[in-house]
Design a protein with these regions (language model features):
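Low-complexity, serine/threonine/proline-enriched polar segments
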Residues: 92-166, 170
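N-terminal glycine/threonine-rich, aromatic-flanked beta-hairpin/loop signature
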Residues: 47-122
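Bacterial N-terminal signal peptides that target proteins for export
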Residues: 1-9
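Edge beta-strand at a domain terminus
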Residues: 95, 101-103, 161-208
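Bacterial N-terminal signal peptides
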Residues: 8-18
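Small side chains
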Residues: 18-20, 37, 68, 73
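N-terminal helix-cap/turn-to-beta initiation motif at the start of protein domains
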Residues: 22-36
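Start-of-domain marker
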Residues: 33, 37-45, 51-55
Length: 208
């Protein structure tokens, strides 16, 4: 009679009581790469929107070494006195993640949030046109310096907005049941609506 190893016995016991499986999960490999958020989930991102802010993109990237990124595309409108500022921004938040069986947990690397200003309108006009009018006659160097100053100030405002709206979530470790099937990543958390993401195709890929 073939002698059972301790591992075999343990696996058998786990299977009998329904606590586990000896088949190794492939999630840690399947999850690698870039994922694009399903548009329908963008309306239900409680901690990324609200007020005058709207989320138009919500993507993930998982690298080797338990590091990754969450990329958020967001528009927001700010009003101060007689000026209205419309911003379209990209927010990149690095994450540290862990895969365990069919589960995924992650936390934000809150000190490494990056903000890029993609578009800025002041009272409906491109901010560079507004700056050019204000520094007219002062030369190209003055114009570039003023544009850089405005951009940096806007980044600071957006970073403050991000930390204000998701400050508490940045401190939390999130856990999800995760699965990858047919190039679709699904994240489930209790009774909440599942989040679904499609694997990002390489730029050179073409449809068959």
């Amino acid at each position: 009679m073939k002698r059972l190893s301790l591992v075999s016995i343990l696996c058998l016991l786990l299977a009998l009581v329904g606590l586990g499986s000896c088949s190794e999960s492939t999630l840690s490999k399947d999850i690698l790469g870039e994922w694009v958020g399903d548009p329908k989930i963008l309306k239900d991102l409680e901690w990324m929107g609200g007020g005058q802010a709207k989320v138009y993109a919500f993507d993930w990237k998982f690298d080797n070494g338990n590091r990754g990124l969450i990329k958020v595309g967001k528009t927001l409108t700010m009003r101060e006195e007689e000026e209205e500022v419309y911003l379209r921004v990209a927010i990149v938040v690095p994450i540290i993640y862990n895969v365990y069986g069919d589960g995924l947990s992650f936390r934000f690397d809150k000190d490494s949030v990056q903000v890029e200003i993609l578009e800025c309108l002041i009272n409906g006009k491109n901010y560079k046109d507004v700056v050019a009018r204000d520094v007219e006659g002062e030369g190209e160097a003055a114009f570039q310096s003023a544009c850089n100053t405005v951009t940096e100030q806007l980044k600071e405002l957006v970073e403050e907005d991000v930390h204000r709206q998701i400050g508490t979530p940045l401190e939390i470790t999130y856990s999800y049941d995760a699965s990858v099937k047919n190039d679709i990543l699904t994240l489930k958390q209790g009774r909440k609506i599942p989040l679904t993401f499609h694997r990002k195709k390489s730029q050179g890929a073409t449809a068959p």
